[in-house]
Each structure stands twice: as structure tokens, then as C-alpha cells.
Amino acid sequence: MIFDALKSKAASLKSDSRVRKLVLACRKLLSEKGEASGASLARETLAFYAELDSDQRVRFFKILALDFSPDPARVLASATAYAQKPSAENLAVLTHVAEPPRQELLRRFNRAPGGTQAIVSMRERLLDALRKDAQLSQVDADFRHLLSSWFNPGFLRLVRVDWNAPAALLEKLIKHEAVHEIRGWNDLHRRLEQDRRCFAFFHPVMPEEPLIFVEVALVKDMAAEIGPLLDVDAAPANPRDCNTAVFYSISNCQPGLRGISLGNFLIKQVVDQLMQEFPRLKRFCTLSPVPGFRDWLKEKAARGFEPQYRIPSEVFAALAQVEAKLGDTLGAGVAELRLQEKRISALRDELLCLVSAYLTGVGEPDGLSGDPVARFHLHNGAKLDRLNWGADAFDKGLRQSLGLMVNYVYEPRRIEYNHEQFVRGVTVASKDVTGRLS
């Protein structure tokens, strides 16, 4: 037991020494004046960081939060000076002292070869730690501030990925596909055929790493179910005969860039590119999952709506029917859901009413849907256009939304208006959706 205690103590001291070594290197890096020596020191500092385990990384992030923040006394003095004399010089001083030193530390990390990728990976670990320690949010704010500038869409390159792309890149598409799993090379090949398009954003300093990619199907009408779009045996259509582009999957490849606005710019640039390549395209829409619907439905069936919100009587009636006839199935696994298909189908109208309520934010404090996919597209300026019953028969679709999917429509001339409405708390939706709530 004594030996075990000594081993534990030694491991703890070694762990502390690694963090201390990294912090000392960070302080030295911040004080370094030379560019060449600074790049070398940045590389060495990032190498120290790479040696840390998960617990040590958390300790390092906490030190960044506590010891690499602005000096409150200097900030107050500079703010007072600026308030008394609001000159450009005093403003510059205030701006300088108010910036957390860790921001400059991150800039200096970026001098090292591969520094940008290292910072993106570092933020991925920070986001993991942030789930358990809200104090780290101030550190994340600095990461997010810098990454938002470094990954500004003006710096990004839009690339069409086709079957002739390097195998390593194609493997990354398979690995990072987040919406509809790519089931091998044949599946990927079909998604890159002549009537399909895949576009990705790349950053100049990470040329081998896709940041985000979107998959598009060129078809002759707005798609109502995902199965035909993913059918590997379906014959490719002539894209020149198609009038509709369906965005059916968008996937982030870099978890460390979560919350950095990339997807909205990607879709808009792809729309522009497709319009140039295929002038006959008249409609740009999505076929989107509703990932939060089943959880929302279970929660409302168990607890109901908050009394302070006005809920349409149709929604109350639909919820009562679903709770009475399907309550025991709402929490069931996929196998049981398939067995109960007839019971679920008998409540089609009620479930469509409820998904309309969910997607338009009925009963939500801000009047907007809590569904992440809905918020993304609606904030991006799309219109909530059509609900599709039985659109996703795959396990994931049944588990998340009882097979329901949605079409969001991007009308280039209406995008800004729709976005402004969403920001004001209004969801722009078709009568197919709103008509179910009255």
C-alpha cells in the first residue's frame, strides 16, 4: 500500500511538472520578441501541450482562465482615463489592456508549423472540458473570437469533391458523414455520380482537411423521402434535365470549429455555383431530418406545455390522442417501433400537427423551434415548406423523428427577408405547416 501511494504521488508530481513546464513555456512565448525564435518556441510549446493527458489539459485550460486574463486594475484605470478623455490614444490603450493575454498566446501558437490545426484540435478538447466546467467559457470565447476571424469565408476555398479526388479525402467524407451514414465505397460512388454534387470548404493552411461538406441531389421534383436519394442501384439522371437541387446532408469535419459560422456560407455559395452550372435549376431545397422531435414529443407527453404560453387547441387535442394511443411506444426501441407501424400511422394527422408545432416553436420561450436543424436552416434564410410522412425508414430516422422529414426551401430573393423574420422570432412557413395548427 505504501508503494502504491508513493507511485501515485510520483505520478501526480510528474503530471504537475508537465503542466508547469507548459505554462512556463507559454509565459516565455508571450515575452519573446524575435519572429524566428518565436516560431521555434511556439513549436516547442505545442509539443509540450501534446504530451498532456485529458486531466492535465483541463488543468492547463483552468490556468489559462485564471492566470491569462486581463488585469482588472489596469482595465479599470484605462477605462477611467478614457471616460475622462475619450481620445483615440486612450481608446487604444484600453483596447490593449482589456484583451486577455491568452488571445495573444493563441496568435503566437499559430506561428508554429501546423499551428492552426493544433489550435483547432485544442479547442475540440476545450469544448469537452467546458461541458463540466462553465468557468472555461471565457477561454472558449477567445478561441471562438480568433477562429471566427481566421476561418472567415473570404479565406476559404470552395471545392467540388468528385470520384477522382484523392483516396485520403474520400475516406474523410466517409468518416465525417454525420446525417446519412455512407455504407462503403459503392455508396460513396453513387453520391458522387453525374446527378449528385459534393462541395467542401478548405482553408489554405489546412489544405488536406475538409472543414465542412454538403451533399446535393439533382432531381426533377422536390424529394419527399430519403431512400431513393441514397439508392446505390438507382440509375443516374442527366443533370441537364433536372430542375431541383436537394441538399440532403451537411457535415462538419472539425469539431474544434463548432459554433464557427461555416454552413450558412457554404449553402449560399453552392447555390450560386449550381445556378451558374445548371441554369435550368429553379428550386433549391433540403430534405432534412428532425432530430429532436421524438425527444420533444416524449417530454410533452409526460409534462405538457408550460401554462404561460398560448397553445393552439389543435395541438392539445393531438397531444392527448398521441399520449393515449401511443404513450407506451414513444420510448420504445427501433424494433418495437417497426412492430407498431400501424398504430403510429393511424395517428398520422396528430403527429403532423405536433411536428408543425415543434418546428414553429409553439410553447418555446423565444417562439422559435429548439430543433438544431430547423434553427440552422431558418436562421440561414430558408422557408419551412413541407412535412414528409414516412420519409426516413432507416433506424436513425425512426429513432429521432418516427420517420418524419422536412423540406426547407431556399429562395434566393427571399433569403434575407426570411432571415430577418427569424431573428425577430417569426418562422416563415408554408400553409402545409401552419394550416395544421388552426
Residue spans for each PLM region:
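Extended, composition-driven regions rather than compact fold-specific motifs
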Residues: 1-260, 264-438
